[in-house]
């Protein structure tokens, strides 16, 4: 079954590489946010206040936001062309056949260039999709860019080393997207947390 899927995937990649990457990243991005929302909603509903008679006071439990899932799907589609071309450039400039040092070069460049770009792109895209405009995107980046990038540097160098060392080009994005399911859960929760903090600040001001 897996070999059949891999054959079809490779055929699709040969025919339309960028579209294949967009579909892969968009699908896995949507899955990651759906899981993140599920975890958040489960915890929120579980901790809902219960009256003395044992009746739950929260009669309107939270439900998943389809809009937020679609924001992750569209983000995956939007960033994939940039990410695939970036990976293809690294593969061409630093071929693994010329030694392990090229893996190190790829990882260092990836973390120095694409990690900051991807982080900024993510929060900007999400904030604009929420209708908060460029000023809102700027404020969001001011609040969460550096903490998120620091967290990125604790996680991604290891996985990108494995990725660049073991995976051929057509599987590098799927591998990264699979790891990114867990990373996007973190980003999704971070983004939602930032939105809640922003909302609470507005309530205090007015």
UniProtKB/Swiss-Prot annotation:
GO BP: mitochondrial transmembrane transport
Topology term for the membrane: Multi-pass membrane protein
UniProt entry keywords in alphabetical sequence: Membrane, Mitochondrion, Mitochondrion inner membrane, Transmembrane, Transmembrane helix
TM annotation in the entry: 107-127, 169-189
A single GO molecular function term of this UniProt record: channel activity
Keyword Calcium: no
InterPro entries reported for this sequence: Mpv17_PMP22
Principal place of residence: mitochondrion
Keyword Transmembrane helix tagged: yes
One matching Pfam family: Mpv17_PMP22
One Gene Ontology cellular component annotation held by this UniProt entry: cytoplasm
Superkingdom to which the source organism belongs: Eukaryota
Locations listed in the record: Mitochondrion inner membrane
Family according to the record: Belongs to the peroxisomal membrane protein PXMP2/4 family.
Official protein name in the record: Protein sym1
Originating species: Schizosaccharomyces pombe (strain 972 / ATCC 24843) (Fission yeast)
Lineage, uppermost ranks: Eukaryota, Fungi, Dikarya, Ascomycota, Taphrinomycotina
């Amino acid at each position: 079954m897996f070999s059949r899927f891999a054959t079809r995937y490779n055929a699709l990649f040969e025919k339309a590489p960028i579209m294949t990457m967009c579909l892969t990243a968009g699908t896995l991005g949507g899955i990651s946010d759906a899981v993140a929302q599920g975890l958040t909603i489960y915890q929120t509903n579980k901790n809902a206040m219960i009256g003395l008679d044992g009746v739950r006071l929260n009669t309107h439990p939270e439900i998943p936001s389809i809009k937020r899932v679609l924001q992750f799907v569209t983000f995956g589609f939007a960033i994939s062309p940039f990410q695939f071309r970036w990976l293809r450039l690294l593969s061409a400039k630093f071929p693994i056949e010329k030694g392990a040092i090229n893996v190190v070069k790829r990882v260092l460049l990836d973390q120095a260039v694409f990690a900051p770009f991807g982080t900024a792109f993510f929060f900007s895209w999400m904030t604009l999709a929420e209708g908060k405009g460029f000023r809102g995107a700027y404020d969001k980046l001011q609040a969460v860019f550096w903490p998120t990038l620091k967290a990125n540097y604790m996680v991604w160098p290891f996985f990108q080393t494995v990725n660049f060392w073991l995976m051929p080009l057509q599987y590098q994005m799927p591998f990264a997207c699979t790891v990114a399911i867990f990373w996007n859960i973190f980003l999704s929760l971070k983004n939602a947390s930032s939105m809640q903090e922003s909302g609470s600040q507005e309530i205090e001001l007015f």
